[in-house]
Amino acid sequence: LFSLLPDLQGKTILDLGCGVGGHCLEFVNGGAKKVVGIDISKKMLEVAEKENHHSKITYLNLPMESLSQISEKFDLVVSSLAIHYVKDFEKLVCDVFNLLNENGLFVFSQEHPLNTCFSEGERWTKDEKGNKLFANISNYSTDGVRESVWFIDGVKKYHRTFSSIINTLVLAGFSIEKLIEPIPTEELLLEFPDH
């Protein structure tokens, strides 16, 4: 995500799904003039206020679906691994577009569609010893809600194909400058061999 960001000096930034505010503080330390971080979790924002407090950061308890409540404009809207939890992606993208200053940027990361697509059957194909060989893909071409486990069972996230994502952005008025797919480092593969 950070490799896609412009020079932050003097920028106003909105962080969607800011969590505990770590990125917000990094943005300020990188020269941002003002950062607004929004998150649906009051508990995460309480941690953000304690651990990542700064006079240039404002934290708001607001779901991404309610961006139209924000009246100011930003140079940059950022979201790290949160957009796949929003049901109405089209509305979100239009709201973000409307919150940007002229020549503003929207930089986001989300769970890869090959991960979000899975909805039935066995997630992994394993060898006779139970070792994971590869992830199974199912229902990639069908956008919609999926349930997963992320600390708890039944977490809802929304799968979208690459074409759905790209076309939604273009229809809202965005020009796509760059797309990067994540590739795990050797260190990450050793640390998390089951993923």
Regions found by a protein language model. Give the residues of each.
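Conserved alpha-helix/loop element of class I SAM-dependent methyltransferases that forms part
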Residues: 1-11, 26
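Class I SAM-dependent methyltransferase SAM/SAH-binding core
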Residues: 14-16, 20-66
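A structural alpha-helix within SAM-dependent methyltransferase catalytic domains
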Residues: 25-28, 49, 93-97, 166, ...
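A short acidic, Gly/Pro-enriched loop at the edge of an enzyme's catalytic core
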Residues: 68-77
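A short SAM/SAH-binding and catalytic strip from SAM-dependent methyltransferases
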Residues: 76-90
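A short glycine-rich, Lys/Arg-flanked "PGG" loop and its adjoining helix->strand segment in the class I
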Residues: 90-105
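Conserved class I S-adenosyl-L-methionine
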Residues: 105-144
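Short alpha-helix
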Residues: 156-179
